[in-house]
Amino acid sequence: GQWNEQGLLICNEIHPARAKILSENVERMGIANAMVTNETPQRLAEVFEEYFTRILVDAPCSGEGMFRKNEAACEEWSTENVKICAERQDGILDCAASMLAPGGRIVYSTCTFAPAENEGSMTRFLLRHPEFHIVEVKKAEGMSAGVPEWAYFEEEKGQVLLEIAQTIRLWPQHLNGEGHYLAVLKKEGTLRQGYCRNGEEKGIAAKDLKVQGKGIVEFLDFAKDTLDPQTLAGSS
């Protein structure tokens, strides 16, 4: 989005090679106030408690939506891998929840059809985190509603949450693209500028909003004392 260089964008990629590619793309696109980290979600959650106002979780998944253009995705698929991915998504989402400020939003997305990784992941998350709810998104042409009844494997039973119908499925036969799923989650509370979970709340002065790059300088000072420099993307 257009944030007039007043925000701070932190992009995390757990695989070092992809993190370096991501760094190059951020630089090539001229994105201001942005940096790339190469950390586990658990490590980030330790130092960014209720820090972010927006979080995008582009979750690792079984890749069923890529079957048409990626033969490797077909060859690597298995029911067991779907379950492994679903468990990994649970952990990532829990970390995202702890890093989100009150009133903030999480956008969750996958490129798979697997219900366990889509409606299932959202249902499990909402049952673990009652402070969150699904935000209904206006559907564009070709978008379909999530299916609450698909939240569980055939052998499983559990609570069906009707608000899962407010999530979105993208089927390749209905639009020009591959298969995807997305949901928007909102955390209870009121989003406030200057919110600080572990300290005194400090408002943001108007003069500070006009200072280009102020946020990134403050973050880099913080990162030097907190994050492992060997895992910052681009480090030697």
Regions found by a protein language model. Give the residues of each.
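Helix-to-beta-strand junctions that scaffold the AdoMet/dcAdoMet cofactor pocket
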Residues: N4, L100-P102
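Conserved Class I S-adenosyl-L-methionine
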Residues: E80-K83, E119-M143, E149, F153
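Conserved beta-strand signature within the Rossmann-like core of class I S-adenosyl-L-methionine
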Residues: R105-T110
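S-adenosyl-L-methionine
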Residues: I10-E50
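Mobile active-site "lid"/loop adjacent to the S-adenosyl-L-methionine
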Residues: A17, T53-D94, C111-N118
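Polybasic, low-complexity RNA-engagement segments
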Residues: N176-Y181, K186-S236
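Residue-level signal for inorganic ion chemistry
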Residues: L9, L22, I55, G104, ...
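Conserved S-adenosyl-L-methionine
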Residues: Q2-L8
